[in-house]
C-alpha cells in the first residue's frame, strides 16, 4: 500500500495526443481519428474521435470489449439486441462486450462521437482494414466495387483476430424504415 511519499513503481510515461500527430483512418463511409491507442494506455482502453456522415456507421457486429461513446454533435440511432435508441448531442451510450449492435447516422448532417473501447484493440482492427487519410474530417477515398467486395469477404477473418465478429448485414433491418435503409445503402455505395 502506498503512503503519501511512495507509490507503486511504473515505467509508463504520460501519453499526449496532439491533433496533427494522430492517425486518421476510414472505415466504410466513416473517418476515425485514433486519439489514444492501446500502446498509450497499457492496452486498458483506446479513445477515438469518429466522424459519421449521413447514412454512415459500421456493419452489424459484436466484440469482446466494452464500447462507450459520447455524441458530441449530431445524432446516431443505436441498435443493440432488439432495441433501438436515438442518441442525440450530449448522450452517452455503453455497449456491453459481445452484445450484437450497430449504429447509424440516420440524419442529414454529420455526427461526431467520442468513443472509448475497453480493453484496447479495436483500433488495431480499424487500422488494418481502412485507408489512412490526412485529417479527422477528410472523407474516405473512392473505393471500387471490386475492392469493397474483397474487403467485405476479408472482414470476418480480420475481425476474429481482434476478438470481434461481423454479423449479417440485415441483422437490424427490422428496426429501420425503408427510407433509413436506403440512406444506409447509399452511404455504403450500394
Q: Which role fits each region the language model picked out?
A:
Residues 47-54, 62-80, 116-119:
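Short, conserved beta-strand element in jelly-roll/cupin
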Residues 31, 68, 75-77, 84, ...:
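Structural motif
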Residues 36-37, 57-63, 104-106:
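Short histidine-centered beta-strand/loop micro-motifs
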Amino acid at each position: 500500500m502506498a503512503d503519501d511519499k511512495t507509490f507503486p513503481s511504473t515505467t509508463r510515461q504520460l501519453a499526449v495526443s496532439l491533433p496533427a500527430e494522430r492517425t486518421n483512418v476510414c472505415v466504410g463511409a466513416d473517418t476515425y481519428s485514433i486519439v489514444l491507442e492501446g500502446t498509450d494506455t497499457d492496452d486498458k482502453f483506446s479513445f477515438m474521435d469518429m466522424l459519421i456522415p449521413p447514412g454512415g456507421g459500421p456493419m452489424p457486429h459484436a466484440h469482446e470489449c466494452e464500447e462507450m461513446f459520447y455524441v458530441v454533435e449530431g445524432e446516431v440511432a443505436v441498435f443493440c439486441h432488439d432495441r433501438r435508441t436515438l442518441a442525440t448531442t450530449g448522450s452517452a451510450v455503453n455497449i456491453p462486450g459481445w452484445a450484437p449492435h450497430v449504429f447509424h447516422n440516420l440524419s442529414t448532417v454529420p455526427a461526431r462521437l467520442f468513443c472509448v473501447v475497453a480493453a484496447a484493440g479495436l483500433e488495431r482492427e480499424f487500422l488494418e482494414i481502412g485507408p489512412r487519410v490526412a485529417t479527422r474530417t477528410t472523407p474516405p477515398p473512392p473505393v471500387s466495387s471490386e475492392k469493397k467486395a474483397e474487403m467485405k469477404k476479408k472482414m470476418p477473418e480480420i475481425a476474429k483476430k481482434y476478438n470481434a465478429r461481423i454479423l449479417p448485414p440485415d441483422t437490424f433491418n427490422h428496426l429501420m424504415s425503408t427510407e433509413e435503409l436506403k440512406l444506409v445503402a447509399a452511404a455504403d455505395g450500394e
